[in-house]
């Protein structure tokens, strides 16, 4: 009876070590951090992910979470008439596009925070001015509150109307790096070329994750 008890303890210990080892192995595969609240479910870690969405791009096409399924993408927020940080951010996204021009697994989603003005036609002209590649760089519009909610609750950044600012809108300067599972893997200052260069490096690193 004593021997049986010892054997049972050994088996339980072995299983516990195996589960711990699997968890360690999974975490070691993550070459970049995961942003957002983490919830533990038994032995699994459940990370914050981008939820479902449906917006319209500069060609009048519907873009949803299915568009970016199993793809890495960079997300940001802007508006077409912005004369402060947006031109610099868009210019830097041109560099990101250029670095992965022939890579269909990398997309860019730029969300307007002024959908009332930024119609499909306006976004199309804006996209042309930055030589955005169709199917790779989507400029998105939709319901204002939906976009603001998406920014705050999914991408964890600011996007809102603000009468206290010269241009009437307040939005984050961050570029968000999203992995194939919809998790936020990096946040970068889109106005800083050094940070944008790091983003490009991190995208290449993220592509090596299994």
Role assignments for model-derived ranges:
Residues 97-101, 130, 151-154, 158, ...:
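Sec/Tat-exported extracytoplasmic proteins
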Residues 1-52, 56, 209-210:
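N-terminal targeting signals for export/organelle localization
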Residues 63-93, 109:
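Short active-site neighborhood of thiol/selenol oxidoreductases, capturing the structured segment around
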Residues 161-210:
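Thiol-/selenol-based redox modules, centered on thioredoxin-like
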Residues 76, 109-112, 174-177:
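Soluble periplasmic/extracytoplasmic beta-strand elements of cell-envelope proteins
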Residues 90-150:
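Structural microenvironment flanking redox-active thiols in thiol-disulfide oxidoreductases
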Residues 50-51, 73, 172-174:
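Short loop/turn microsegments at loop-to-beta-strand junctions
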């Amino acid at each position: 009876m004593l021997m049986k008890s010892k054997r049972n303890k050994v088996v339980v210990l072995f299983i516990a070590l195996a589960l711990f080892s699997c968890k360690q192995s999974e975490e070691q595969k993550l070459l970049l951090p995961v942003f957002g609240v983490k919830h533990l479910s038994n032995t699994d870690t459940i990370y914050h992910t981008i939820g479902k969405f449906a917006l319209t791009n500069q060609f009048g096409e519907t873009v949803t979470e299915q568009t970016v399924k199993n793809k890495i993408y960079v997300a940001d927020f802007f508006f077409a008439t912005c004369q402060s940080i947006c031109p610099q951010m868009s210019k830097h996204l041109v560099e990101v596009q250029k670095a992965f021009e022939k890579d269909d697994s990398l997309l860019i989603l730029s969300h307007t925070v002024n959908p009332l003005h930024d119609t499909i036609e306006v976004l199309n002209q804006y996209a042309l001015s930055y030589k955005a590649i169709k199917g790779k760089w989507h400029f998105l519009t939709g319901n204002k509150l939906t976009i603001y909610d998406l920014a705050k609750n999914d991408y964890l950044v600011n996007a809102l109307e603000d009468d206290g600012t010269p241009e009437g809108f307040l939005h984050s300067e961050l570029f968000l790096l999203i992995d194939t599972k919809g998790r936020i893997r990096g946040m970068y200052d889109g106005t800083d070329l050094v940070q944008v260069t790091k983003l490009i490096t991190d995208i290449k690193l993220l592509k090596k994750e299994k």
